[in-house]
């Protein structure tokens, strides 16, 4: 993987039709708790403003991919590429844990360790690794997927689009320095807005709705 600068930041927002929506931010930060509280307050304020602007104007996953290809030169990652293999492996594990945990037997629930106890943490990590290996060995037919990984490049940095047509999953993640992040943030907002929401999403505040609001509130 390419080495990022010390000021590199990354953001991932992932959501599915029924699954959880997650936001991951990573970067070097020495902010104090007060600054974090202020930042969170600003985010909540922005979120309320964004919610008032959301209207139903949905597009399908296929339409969104074509839109990104036409406007941002989106390219697809080959299934043989390491990144694709890692992503689909993670998706398979996530889907089995969420929808078919019974296949894992006693490994479906791994107790959280005592983080002050090194032996407890090592045992926990060992079980997580064993479970991941168990899932990886399961046939793909157990949890059918139609996964595709795409990229939009800006110089040496890129935005990734993760899509699964079977599970209706749409996710974006990107990284880079502040200048690149600003561009990717704008692209991300445009793509989430184009994917949009249905009237039912707005009415029921679905995961798809939450995903859009979250992205536009960042």
Language model segments and positions:
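Mature, Sec-exported extracytoplasmic domains of Gram-positive
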Residues: 1-17, 21-218
């Amino acid at each position: 993987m390419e080495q990022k600068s010390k000021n590199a930041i990354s953001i991932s927002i992932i959501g599915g039709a029924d699954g959880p929506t997650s936001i991951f931010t990573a970067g070097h930060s020495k902010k104090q708790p007060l600054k974090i509280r202020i930042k969170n307050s600003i985010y909540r304020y922005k979120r309320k403003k964004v919610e008032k602007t959301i209207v139903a104007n949905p597009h399908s996953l296929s339409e969104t991919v074509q839109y990104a290809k036409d406007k941002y030169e989106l390219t697809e990652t080959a299934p043989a590429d390491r990144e694709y293999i890692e992503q689909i492996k993670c998706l398979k594990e996530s889907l089995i844990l969420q929808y078919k945990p019974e296949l894992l037997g006693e490994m479906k629930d791994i107790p959280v360790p005592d983080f002050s106890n090194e032996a407890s943490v090592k045992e926990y990590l060992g079980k997580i690794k064993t479970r991941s290996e168990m899932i990886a060995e399961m046939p793909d037919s157990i949890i059918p997927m139609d996964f595709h990984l795409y990229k939009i490049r800006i110089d040496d940095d890129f935005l990734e689009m993760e899509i699964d047509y079977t599970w209706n999953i749409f996710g974006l993640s990107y990284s880079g320095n502040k200048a690149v992040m600003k561009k990717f943030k704008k692209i991300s907002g445009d793509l989430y807005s184009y994917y949009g929401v249905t009237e039912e999403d707005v009415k029921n505040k679905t995961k798809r709705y939450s995903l859009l609001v979250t992205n536009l509130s960042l």
